Amino acid sequence: MASKYDPQIAESKWQGEWDKADLFKAKSPADAGDMPKAYVLEMFPYPSGRLHMGHVRNYAMGDVVARHKKAKGFNVLHPMGWDAFGMPAENAAMERNVHPGDWSYQNIAAMKAQFAKLGLSLDWSREFATCDPDYYGEQQRLFLKFMDKGLVYQKKAKVNWDPVDNTVLANEQVVDGKGWRSGAVVEQRELVQWFFRITDYAEDLLNEVQKLERWPEKVRTMQANWIGRSEGLQMRFEWADASDEILRQHVADLDKVMSEGVEIFTTRPDTLYGASFIALSPDHPLTIELAADNDALTSFRAECAKVGTSEADIEKAPKMGFDTGLKVKHPFTGETLPVYVANFVLMGYGTGAIFACPAHDQRDFDFARKYDLPIIPVVKPSGDEASEPWVTSGKGADMDAAFTGVGTIMNFDFLNGKTIDAAKSEAIAKIAELGLGKKTTNYRLRDWGVSRQRYWGCPIPVIHCGDCGIVPVPTADLPVELPRDVSFEKPGNPLFHHPAWKDVDCPKCGKAAQRETDTLDTFNDSSWYFARFASIDDQAERAYWLPVDQYVGGVEHAVLHLLYARFFTRAMRDVGEVDLPSGEPFAGLFTQGMVTHETYKSAEGKWLEPSMVARDGETVTEIATGKPVEVGDIIKMSKSKKNTVDPDKIIATFGADTARWFVLSDSPPERDIEWTQSGAEGAARFVQRVWAMFDDLPDTKPAAPEGKSDLRVASHKAAAAMDKAIEEFRFNAAIAEFYTWLNAIKKGAGEPDANRYEAASMLARCLPPFMPHLAEECWARIGGEGHVSAAAWPVSDQSLLTEDSITMPIQVNGKRRGEVSVPKDMAKDDVEATAMAEPAVKAFLEGKTIKKVIVVPGRIVNIVIA
């Protein structure tokens, strides 16, 4: 036997053995019999062509769960596929002059080879890529079923346009006013778009997310905030007589506009008496109509459009307004309020119009100060703030900022002295009595715009006919495949410039028609892939596997992929595609931390890769030049900062088990982990320690162990503790048990061979979730049957987990003076006698008068002295 473990030889050997044995293929429901099922899934990767250490950590965590479940007797489904559509492939095609499909499939092959080196327990029999026609053909069929159900519609809408990627972005894909992929400043354009009615499920999505007890609280909160349920008042402000002339000049349907007034939604009807102006969104229908023949308002709207589209950008932007000259009547006082167009009002929330109460909303306050509008306080604070000058005077002129806290109502006629909640209810009731409005529930969530003006995506399966309108592609004609002969020379969508593909006959009337040239947002592809892994078309098998029992992925997907997947599953349920009453796709969710690394800059200010620098104590230099290197922050590994570590190089140097061990051991899995060379070297040394321990075992399997030795107790406790730690996603705690266990085995070198063999056998069976290749080699070394990756988790002997003795502290007048170890079932009198005889306690009590001794069984001994 080799004196040193060689990971390169062992890992290649065992990966081949697993493949030959088809060890990780899930059993069919019929073959599984009474086995419980466990569907373990990590968010499938985009095939960029290279794995990074973040991938290694994510998939290693999923593998820990999958291997542990298999060892516990579960029928495990642990599949892998590829999220292959999207703009990066299309951009790569343009840059490299290759077809996006060729580029994607080449990358898939390269990454699949990398996955194999990691020793993951994946069921590759269910592999697919979302760019496979079979996959997106099924997606097209789902689209048509959603369409039949009324969950799909088309409308002209203001969209977020990415001028670099030449496509529409969903609100969630706009980050700080920029495209989430390109980083370009997003523009607003009006286009005809396809939408999914996700808002039909808003209430259900909100209510049910709080019931997902095995999801992180942070993710549940993020989804709840994104859905954004708010209760308030929707009411109509009627036009003042002074508005008649302006409306006659600028609006086409005067009667309609006059009768509707200005509809607003507010969550603060208690502040109605503090209203001093009305604000319309720049995209409000009335604003657009007024701007049609008003150059100044048109210019103002254009200026507003330059501000980013996100709420954060609008919040930070200087407040701007345009006085329309229109006025409305206050419903309670009859006074007139001016109507402005304001850049901080969002058309996508409520009605796109608000009443402004500057005294109690900071945006309104800033706007009122800028345009010299009244500020009327109507909420009186309590406590220290009650002595503010504006409270005493009741005048907004004395306010330095809006008061947004709680208090009681002032300056509000019939609501004075009421609490905010009581005032809200009474104000709503009064408005309803006047016939001007009613209590309403509103959602921040908007319908999902799914049209994208790109080639490399799932074609939308409809045909536009001049006579028949929108016609679904017949199911028999699916999939509508992407043409390969496309050109990326013209800007925009190549499908639009491909007449041979675009021009077709209408399937309804036979006349000339055109295909829809938009493709689906790629978040569609990942919104149902978990159901495809469960089964291609067998509803019973799909029902058996769903929901996913444990999903693993990044928290950055909280309000994108995870919300869309929850909607999709509900829609699939409602069209008969999944038998999942709850509509929840993921029973358990774990969001892992990132892998981070120091950043390095050369003397010339260029980013350097970790492999380009040398460290000698605190001194870091560039290997090529010998010049000092600036060591920067420890941040997420990034290609742009070059602080990445190539998993292939790590595996070639240390082996996959070392890489897995390190990314799982250094910190709790939900936290970020810093990759360090010294940490990897330490993990590699531990691999050799484990192997050396097995190397020292007898060559023949000894008799069964007996008795309650220290080593047996340590082994059975460690196996039980690791079992619990893995169940609770405390992988670093499970790994800590390994170190303790190995030390116990070293201390137990003098114990009988049977006890040492039992310890080694148990350790080998606990090792596969973390270091599967080493585990197989160790298992073979001690003559274990079959593959240890298929072996059962060791069952701990409960009698060995029970402590025979306990340690009790001894206090004298409330201060600890010693401790004593006694049998668990020792009588109180005997415990007292043993405690009194403890040398340190006995010495302390010498010459003192003992008043009382209190023994709390199993807990503590209290001695009271005079």
Where are these regions (language model features)?
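Conserved oxyanion/phosphate-binding beta-strand-loop segments in alpha/beta enzyme cores
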Residues: 1-41, 70-79, 101-113, 214, ...
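Basic, alpha-helical terminal appendages of large translation-related enzymes
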Residues: 1-35, 269, 281-284, 294-295, ...
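Long, charged, mostly alpha-helical binding arms that flank functional sites
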Residues: 2-5, 230-234, 380-383, 391-393, ...
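Residue patterns forming the tRNA-binding/recognition surfaces of aminoacyl-tRNA synthetases
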Residues: 4, 13, 17-21, 95-262, ...
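Amphipathic alpha-helical
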Residues: 10, 15, 199-229, 281-322, ...
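N-terminal catalytic cores of NTP/NDP-binding nucleotidyl/phosphoryl-transfer enzymes
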Residues: 29-98, 127-142, 266-267, 331-367, ...
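Catalytic alpha/beta core of large soluble enzyme barrels
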Residues: 62, 75, 284-382, 402
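Helix-rich, typically C-terminal accessory recognition domains appended to large enzymatic cores
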Residues: 83, 144, 148-161, 439-468, ...
